Amino acid sequence: MAQTEKKAGLLRRTSSSKKPLKEKVVLMYDEIFMKEDPTKNSPRFWDELFLMKVNLEYLEGKLESLDGDEFMKIKDNINSLFHHCVQALAEEHQIKVVNALQTLCALFRGVHQKNKSATGFDIINMLIGFDKAELRMKELMESLDSLLCGDGSESLKSLCLKLLLCLVTVTDNISQNTILEYVMINSIFEAILQILSDVSSRSQHGYDSVVLLALLVNYRKYESVNPYIVKLSIVDDEPTLDGLGMVIHHALTEYNRQYKEKEEENQGGFFSTLSSMVGSMFIADADEKLSVQTNEAILLALYEAVHLNRNFITVLAQSHPEIDMAATPATPVPASPTTPLGTTPPSLDLMNNPELPLDPNLQTSNLLITFLKYSSIVMQDTKDEHRLNSARLCLIILTCIAEDQYADAFLHDDNMNFRVNLHRMPMRHRKKAADKNIPCRPLVCAVLDLMVEFVVTHMMKEFPMDLYVRCVQIIHKLICYQKKCRVRLHYTWRELWSALINLLKFLLSNETGLLAKHNIFQLALQVVNLFNMFITYGDTFLPTPSSYDELYYEIIRMHQVFDNLYCMVLRVSTNAGQWKEPASKVTHALVNVRAIINHFNPKIESYAAVNHISQLSEDQVLEVVRSNYDTLTLKLQDGLDQFERYSEQPREAGFFKELVRSISLNVRKNVSLTTMSQDVLLKEFSSIS
């Protein structure tokens, strides 16, 4: 009996001996699913229907239970239901509007769920009627636009956004959702911008608005002109762009906070004790306990903003106090059902409150810092496809930032120094860096730290080649800017050089296994050319002459790695095979590195012999280097400071299609009109006649 009740919707028992009675709304739904026009026997049928509390489960279930032939028999009634839902949105009676919005959601979901194989045009015909579709959808979008932009209830606005999210995500592939053509024609872009630019509405609806915008931008973006892409690319209104940045910033901040909380819990707990007892063999297990589900929807919104809108770059650098989200009492905001577990957006009132006490010693932050911290967490673990994609998206965003002139200017600005506490993967051979020891530096140092951290920590069997290539490209783009603008950055360059040499060492040690899956010569060439950049132009951007000397010291100290690399690429390039050409490019690229090694090594050996020293100190090697620069001959290499600019299509199109599909499925799973309790809504509007 309990099973029957669940299936039939909300049922009411009169007594244990009598059959349970169906509630009135369920009986009215049943009438719609009969062939006859329900108004035949009840002229006020539609008026009454929208005064009834919606039974979403029953209505969706009923739609899903029909096969194609059965559906076509009641198509006129379904079209009529859709039409009256749209009409009800213009009613002054708020309860009718609430019920109409929820009914529309059930219609969109139910019809699509049952007819997954049907074409978009068939779906439109079943749901709206093809001849009336343009008019009905225009009316629907205008009503939603009015509700979102009006001074009405915040709950209604929330419901409108949830309906739109429901509509956008009913198909697995967003670009196959033909109904969205009407959302393109009847744009709600301005309504979304209005929400983002207003402090109050942003705090309540910002998250859903940003996710909705990110999805709409990806509708048929490669096949046709998408008006949301065009409009987003030209937004120059500061409050709107700030609002967009604020929503993204807070979603990422909340993720970082949750991760930090979990990390602190674990440090004082069982895994910490166990690790200290038996070494670090359990670190991987302990680390997995820290995983908080990543938030690709917000990351996609950040990507689209950075990629499409040059004005948004300024938002990345806007400073504001860094507030401990856990310690600050926040006005509770209902968790957005589109938010995955672990990414509930915090109250945006925290940053919007002008009365916040500003402590002069308070660390300042900005969206870029928050994003770098987020990336440092996400990029730690790339073992599964989901996290790998998250890390890839972070690196794509950083690629767009690294090749933007304005972004590079503030990244390297000596007057904008920040202390950025990146998360570092637990490793046996290194201690955890104390946060307070991190100096205030230009932001580019944090970006380089993040790249070095990734290079050092992902040399493993399941080698993420694509991420490594992107990482090295980001470093290259930053160095190109430094060379071009003669920026002498005070950075621990030795850590970068050491990480890159160890990467080459790893490629050599795992040549056979890696070559079965990857073109390792492409990555090796990029790394060698980074060294060529330092060798050829280092005197124009390294901070001091001694930094340039240290570069030579590192190359000489680790000469065995470069010698082995040369032997390997020479062997491969002299044999016929698929890697002949890429290997020969590395051979040519090594000319200056080999010249340095072959020039200085005999001089160092001679110095040691003359002075009867078995092992030279670093200072002694540096002395030999400085005294013998004048006799060193290097070859001028062209194109070292050139790079291919990022382009989404065609290279990244497949990645973004799959990413949007994954986000869409997640939003569909989490968007639920029942989470915004009907009882709460109806109670809110019960006094409105």
Curated annotation (Swiss-Prot):
Coiled coil: none
Pfam families per the UniProt record, alphabetical: ARMH3_C
Tree of life domain: Eukaryota
Disulfide bond residue pairs: none
Membrane topology value: Single-pass membrane protein
Gene Ontology CC: cytosol; Golgi membrane
Keyword Membrane applies: yes
InterPro entries: ARM-type_fold, ARMD3-like, ARMH3_C
Location(s), subcellular: Golgi apparatus membrane; Cytoplasm
GO BP annotations listed: regulation of Golgi organization
UniProt keyword annotations, A-Z: Cytoplasm, Golgi apparatus, Membrane, Transmembrane, Transmembrane helix
TM helices/strands, residue ranges: 520-538
Entry similarity comment: Belongs to the ARMH3 family.
Stated role: May be involved in Golgi maintenance and protein secretion.
Stated name of the protein: Armadillo-like helical domain-containing protein 3
